[in-house]
Amino acid sequence: MLKFTAIAALAAISLSAPAFAAGDVVAGEKIFGKCKACHAIIGDDGTVIQKGGKVGPNLYGVVGRPLASYPDFKYGDGIKAAAAKGLIWDEAMLTAYVVDPTKWLDENSGDPKAKSKMAFKLATGAEDVVAYLASLKPAMPAP
């Protein structure tokens, strides 16, 4: 009986834990330092989570957000073409994008000549950065 109770407790804990990308959130926060030259993370209430540049869009809540949807940001044609397909950023898609943005656009925009405005490629640590970004979600509205 004790064994069953322990297994049931572990199952309940694992089911209640938030599901993030396969990466390491703490490592991703550190690696995000490479992204701050172009990107900031600013909460919906204006709280600055990561001070950074404005060359790229704010990355708060990016996981789960439709592509090219951050207000008033001037996206390139390639990412807008991919967005027209109704794509939503998920962990796997965002990881592939930050590893090689132009290759990702080539595969997902329908335009083999599409170029990304994001020239930086995150060769290592992409899953960690995406796990970090996925952990920064807007609060759910109260019922």
Where does each model-flagged region fall?
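Bacterial N-terminal signal peptides
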Residues: A8-S16
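Sec/Tat signal peptide C-region and signal peptidase I cleavage site
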Residues: A17-A22
